[in-house]
Swiss-Prot record:
This is ATP synthase subunit b, chloroplastic. Keywords: ATP synthesis, ATP-binding, CF(0), Chloroplast, Hydrogen ion transport, Ion transport, Membrane, Nucleotide-binding, Plastid, Thylakoid, Transmembrane, Transmembrane helix, Transport. Pfam families: ATP-synt_B. F(1)F(0) ATP synthase produces ATP from ADP in the presence of a proton or sodium gradient. F-type ATPases consist of two structural domains, F(1) containing the extramembraneous catalytic core and F(0) containing the membrane proton channel, linked together by a central stalk and a peripheral stalk. During catalysis, ATP synthesis in the catalytic domain of F(1) is coupled via a rotary mechanism of the central stalk subunits to proton translocation. Component of the F(0) channel, it forms part of the peripheral stalk, linking F(1) to F(0). The chain crosses the membrane at residues 27-49. In plastids the F-type ATPase is also known as CF(1)CF(0). InterPro entries: ATP_synth_b/b'su_bac/chlpt. F-type ATPases have 2 components, F(1) - the catalytic core - and F(0) - the membrane proton channel. F(1) has five subunits: alpha(3), beta(3), gamma(1), delta(1), epsilon(1). F(0) has four main subunits: a(1), b(1), b'(1) and c(10-14). The alpha and beta chains form an alternating ring which encloses part of the gamma chain. F(1) is attached to F(0) by a central stalk formed by the gamma and epsilon chains, while a peripheral stalk is formed by the delta, b and b' chains. Belongs to the ATPase B chain family.
Amino acid sequence: MKNVTHSFVFLAHWPSAGSFGLNTDILATNLINLTVVVGVLIYFGKGVLKDLLDNRKQRILSTIRNSEELRRGTIEQLEKARIRLQKVELEADEYRMNGYSEIEREKANLINATSISLEQLEKSKNETLYFEKQRAMNQVRQRVFQQAVQGALGTLNSCLNTELHFRTIRANISILGAMEWKS
């Protein structure tokens, strides 16, 4: 590359001896000078241009390769992230289902416990009602019995005279006496 640059510098400072030389005045140049300059540029510039284009091509290819590697790495990371997301979603669904089933289980247990408590309360209420009914019936029986006894005593006291009273006592004494003799 240095040789090419030195050649251009050498041609640019070539002494003009009259017949052949490089004319730097573009308006004063002729077709032959232009052809020579273009030919030299093509001959020497072809290698330089090829080197520049090859370097540029290599950089572009290198950039493309790096981009492809980055893209592949990004795709792999994306796939890993998707897999993790699916796993987390499955775990979340599992926790949600376990939570719902736990809630349903607790609900069923609470309903069962409440049902049992209600049954016990109903049984206790029925027993209390039965005992209260029995007590009320016993009180009514007792009052009826007391009234009957008082009525009978009243009737007996009004109907009994002294003679009937003595006769009843003698009959009872004779019954008791007969019982004593048998034993």
